[in-house]
């Protein structure tokens, strides 16, 4: 059982208790801190849609520390990021691997960051199937289709040629923040919050 810290906020004569995630949400911060699955995707999408309804023009910050996970669940988050009108900045802390890196690159151009000791990893989608040969062939074709789709989206978001992304994702490809910046996955490596404020003021 995981413990969720509570935050007490005092306003005037009253006090209000928030779980830490609700308090962060109040500041338009969404945290992806686990494997990407259908449940996590639903929660992230719900938070993004809620924050857009509160203010469709104010920035939302998506902090990512994720090993990746389900492609379809990740694409649900990706499509929601693109669907809402509020700009979304992305920040990698710890690691953004696989679908985590894909979502890191999906932030608004100019607002994609990584902390200095974070790790980014990109690769092609993988899957294991058992059953009849015909069914295995069907699933293999779907994986190849998803591979091409993900690579084309990543090429678009990084500004790199499609063939470069295909080569970069052929195997597990671990990147430092500086290497991720060179590839176009992020725009800047942040050491402190002041770096982010300076970036936005420029």
Curated annotation (Swiss-Prot):
GO terms for molecular function: ATP-dependent peptidase activity; ATPase binding; serine-type endopeptidase activity. HAMAP family: ClpP (MF_00444). It catalyses: Hydrolysis of proteins to small peptides in the presence of ATP and magnesium. alpha-casein is the usual test substrate. In the absence of ATP, only oligopeptides shorter than five residues are hydrolyzed (such as succinyl-Leu-Tyr-|-NHMec, and Leu-Tyr-Leu-|-Tyr-Trp, in which cleavage of the -Tyr-|-Leu- and -Tyr-|-Trp bonds also occurs). The active site is at residues 98, 123. The keyword Protease applies. Its main location: cytoplasm. It comes from the Bacteria. Cleaves peptides in various proteins in a process that requires ATP hydrolysis. Has a chymotrypsin-like activity. Plays a major role in the degradation of misfolded proteins. It is found in: Cytoplasm. InterPro entries: ClpP, ClpP/crotonase-like_dom_sf, ClpP/TepA, ClpP_His_AS, ClpP_Ser_AS. Pfam families: CLP_protease (PF00574). One of its GO terms (cellular component) is endopeptidase Clp complex. This is ATP-dependent Clp protease proteolytic subunit. PANTHER family: ATP-DEPENDENT CLP PROTEASE PROTEOLYTIC SUBUNIT, ATP-DEPENDENT CLP PROTEASE PROTEOLYTIC SUBUNIT, MITOCHONDRIAL. Keywords: Cytoplasm, Hydrolase, Protease, Serine protease.
């Amino acid at each position: 059982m995981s413990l969720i810290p509570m935050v007490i906020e005092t306003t005037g004569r009253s006090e209000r208790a928030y779980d830490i995630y609700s308090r962060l949400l109040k500041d338009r911060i969404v945290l992806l801190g686990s494997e990407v699955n259908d449940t996590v995707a639903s929660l992230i999408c719900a938070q993004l849609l809620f924050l857009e309804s509160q203010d469709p023009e104010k920035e939302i910050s998506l902090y990512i520390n994720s090993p990746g996970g389900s492609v379809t669940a990740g694409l649900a988050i990706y499509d929601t990021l693109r669907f809402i009108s509020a700009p979304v900045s992305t920040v990698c802390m710890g690691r953004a691997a696989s679908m985590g890196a894909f979502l890191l690159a999906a932030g608004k151009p100019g607002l994609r960051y990584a902390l200095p000791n974070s790790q980014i990893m990109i690769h092609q989608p993988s899957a294991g199937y058992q059953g009849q040969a015909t069914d295995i062939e069907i699933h293999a074709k779907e994986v190849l289709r998803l591979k091409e789709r993900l690579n084309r989206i990543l090429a678009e978001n990084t500004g790199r040629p499609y063939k470069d992304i295909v080569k970069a994702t052929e195997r597990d490809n671990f990147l430092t923040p500086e290497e991720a910046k060179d590839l176009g996955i992020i725009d800047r490596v942040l050491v402190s919050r002041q770096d982010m404020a300076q970036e936005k003021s420029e």
